[in-house]
Regions:
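Short active-site loops of ABC-family nucleotide-binding domains
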Residues: 11, 31, 39, 43, ...
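Helix-loop junctions and hydrophobic alpha-helical segments within the transmembrane domains
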Residues: 21, 25, 134, 235, ...
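An intracellular "coupling" helix at the cytosolic face of ABC transporter transmembrane type-1 domains
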Residues: 30-31, 47-56, 60, 64, ...
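Transmembrane helices of ABC transporter permease
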Residues: 58-112, 185-196
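Hydrophobic alpha-helical segments in the permease module
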Residues: 92-100, 165-179, 198-223
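ABC-type nucleotide-binding domain
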Residues: 247, 254-507
Length: 507
């Protein structure tokens, strides 16, 4: 019964920790992920939680049992013979000093083991995600060596913990045996002197074993405690991490917006970086307008659009929708009116319908199909073995890059956003498909009066934009329509000639 209840309790601890960790990870800001390795996070949710679970089960019960036995045996020894008890207990402080030094040394070692395991998981995760790139460049041997190097580090750290055990516990046993030797010597002299019987000495020595056993048990458990403590510290680093972007206590729901977007002296730098990515950016986009963002590499294009749904918070100035500062409204009400199609398309394991309806799980099949038609995805989806019920693999394996992007566009359109953000969202489709998608997007923008921000790589995307912003080193170097910038902006013409692709046929 004790074993069952202990295991049930430990599984409950692990269950609650996993839920709490995942819930926190879902809400941490993007700045946190910019500083953390995926492998380290996976290790904390798996291996570190398991170390805590193991100690929370058998370890806690054994520790409590050892403490009770130690206390009870001490009282019994003092009751039987005060002098012999004092001789026996004289070694106890020395044992606890040795154990304390052991715990202080082993704790950082266990933390290093978990960190090395996290690095190993990071390499594994990177290689599994990039297996095609590895094969394409024939880097299998290099990646094998890289994995072996991290694995060697993990092995070395584990062996160091083993050596720490080997270098400390023999001394603990030695001191414990000194206590037994003292009892036999001092008690034997008293037997010879006639003040103690042989039976009493044997009984006392037997009880002494009940004193040393819990001490040694506590010693062994101290290693498990140190390991669980190191894992707990890593787990609570996540649980105690501040959420950089969250609702204010007095945040209000954002009402349905016409979506007038205003950047007012916006400044931004990434957490831990002193370099400003955006430096006092100010502009205004009226409802229903399309704003194209262009700029040199590292000029802050993606950063600018990431501030609209509050993936990050500005470090100066303000971003407003219809006059509402995005920091003063709830995240759910803000993001429910924003549709985003990123350059790197992510699909989840599940059906095509589930992926398109990810933002609106209650959407009907007719609504899903309408969004797919608008994104020019309906035709190829209907050709799949089970149509919209076809299951796609992890990250959309089985679909081409262009097909994945069209599903992502359909997913964004289905939520009927008032603000649509396209981060080079047609980069993986051919020219004919890009022209068809662009035509549909243009029609949807005009008919629904959506405000659109687009980071583009093709001339056709920016030619018809109502406002083009040219960024350079975090500042707006030029703004205006295509015709105005062709006449007035040297930087725009350089980008036009060097970075943008020609307009597709029919675009």
């Amino acid at each position: 019964m004790q074993g069952y209840l202990a295991e049930k309790a430990s599984q409950g601890v692990a269950y609650d920790l996993r839920n709490a960790l995942f819930e926190k990870i879902e809400r941490l800001g993007f700045g946190y992920y910019d500083r953390q390795e995926t492998g380290q996070l996976v290790t904390r949710l798996t291996s570190d939680v398991e170390q805590i679970r193991t100690f929370a089960g058998s370890g806690v019960v054994q520790l409590a049992s050892a403490a009770i036995m130690l206390l009870g045996t001490t009282v019994l020894l003092l009751f039987l013979d005060l002098q012999l008890a004092l001789v026996a207990l004289a070694t106890v402080p020395a044992i606890f000093v040795l154990l304390l030094r052991f715990v202080q040394r082993i704790g950082p070692l266990f933390r290093g083991v978990q960190q090395a395991l996290g690095r190993l998981n990071t390499v594994l995760q990177e290689d599994l995600s990039g297996v095609k790139t590895i094969r394409a460049y024939a880097r299998e041997d290099y990646e094998t060596d890289r994995y072996r190097e991290v694995n060697d580090d993990l092995l070395g750290r584990n062996l160091e913990t083993v050596r720490t055990f080997a270098n400390n516990f023999p001394f603990v046993f030695f001191v414990a045996n000194l206590g037994t030797l003292g009892i036999v010597l001092f008690g034997g002299l008293r037997v010879i002197g006639g003040t103690l019987t042989v039976g009493e000495l044997i009984a006392f020595n037997t009880y002494l074993g009940f004193l040393l056993f819990p001490i040694l048990t506590i010693g062994f458990l101290s290693a498990a405690f140190s390991r669980a403590g190191a894992s707990a510290a890593r787990v609570f680093e996540i649980l105690d991490a501040p959420i950089e972007v969250e609702d204010k206590p007095d945040a209000v729901a954002l009402p349905p917006v016409r979506c007038r977007v205003e950047f007012d002296g916006v400044r931004f730098r990434y957490p831990g970086d002193e370099r400003e990515v955006l430096k006092g950016v100010s502009f205004c986009v009226e409802p229903g307008q399309t704003a194209a963002i262009l700029g040199t590499t590292g000029s802050g294009k993606s950063t600018l659009v990431n501030l609209l749904p509050r993936f990050y918070d500005v470090t100066g100035g303000a971003v407003r929708l219809d006059g509402h500062d995005v920091r003063d409204v709830t995240l759910s009400s803000l993001r429910s009116q924003v549709g985003i199609v990123l350059q790197e398309t992510l699909l989840f394991s599940g059906t095509v319908r589930d992926n398109i309806a990810y933002g609106r799980p209650d959407a009907t099949l007719d609504e899903v199909e309408a969004a797919a038609r608008a994104a020019r995805a309906d035709e190829f989806v209907q050709g799949l073995p089970e149509g919209y019920g076809t299951v796609v693999g992890e990250r959309g394996i089985g679909l081409s890059g262009g097909q994945r992007q069209r599903i992502a566009i359909a997913r964004a359109l289905l939520v009927d956003p008032r603000l649509l953000i396209l981060d080079d969202s047609t980069s993986a489709v051919d020219a004919e498909t890009e022209a068809a998608i662009q035509e549909s997007l243009d029609r949807l923008m005009r008919e629904e009066h959506r405000t659109v921000f687009v980071i583009a790589q093709r001339v056709s995307t920016v030619r018809d934009a109502d406002l083009i912003l040219v960024l350079d080193e975090g500042e707006i170097a030029a703004r205006g329509t295509h015709e105005e910038l062709v006449r007035t902006s040297e930087l725009y013409n350089e980008i036009l000639g060097s970075q943008l692709e020609p307009a597709p046929a029919g675009g």
